[in-house]
């Protein structure tokens, strides 16, 4: 099950115990938690391509989504599906998750490759958000759904209320898609225009095409970030056009 060495160094074990105490977790097997902090840049540099948190992140993303959707469904009976989807998208967005990861000091426990470390990987939103999802996935495997659900709800409740109070920027890709479908009966088409930089410090440029009009390209340190940036510009432009035409 574990693609990394089975034993934990005393210093690393102490670090993991410190994290789970302040995060309110209790792992039966700390190796799972350790794996959740291993970024692919480290495994790639050490020629062990499976010793990273990507599979745990995949699982944690699904657990997070289910818990968030279930909580919203039960807690906001008067809200329509579209509004619940917007709240969920914002609450589990990379921006929101990275903020939560920062509160948990996840950056202190990450295991990164040398190049990623030198490029400031510990502070990158995508890496922090992915690591948090990996921790959720690891806790689900270790302690079951109910324990993972309890942990996620503890993280999510304040975030969801912040979303409702408009403290978080919405998921512009979701907002744009809904607006475009309603206005033009089609969907936005994103296109990667350019990618540059080494693997550990890439920059991506995306444009979005809507009903024959192209917005962008705009850049981001991840594909998601670049898509969100250009979606925000397109959404705000379309909203302005709608206001002017009224």
UniProtKB/Swiss-Prot annotation:
Species of provenance: Treponema denticola (strain ATCC 35405 / DSM 14222 / CIP 103919 / JCM 8153 / KCTC 15104)
A GO biological process held by the record: tRNA processing
Binding site residues for Mg(2+): 57, 130, 133
Subunit structure and binding partners: Homodimer.
MF term (GO), any: ribonuclease III activity
The UniProt record lists the keyword tRNA processing: yes
Gene name as annotated: rnc
Domain of life: Bacteria
InterPro entries, sorted: dsRBD_dom, RNase_III, RNase_III_dom, RNase_III_sf
Protein name: Ribonuclease 3
Keyword rRNA processing recorded: yes
HAMAP family in alphabetical order: RNase_III
Active-site residue list: 61, 133
Cofactor: Mg(2+)
Pfam families: dsrm (PF00035), Ribonucleas_3_3 (PF14622)
Stated family: Belongs to the ribonuclease III family.
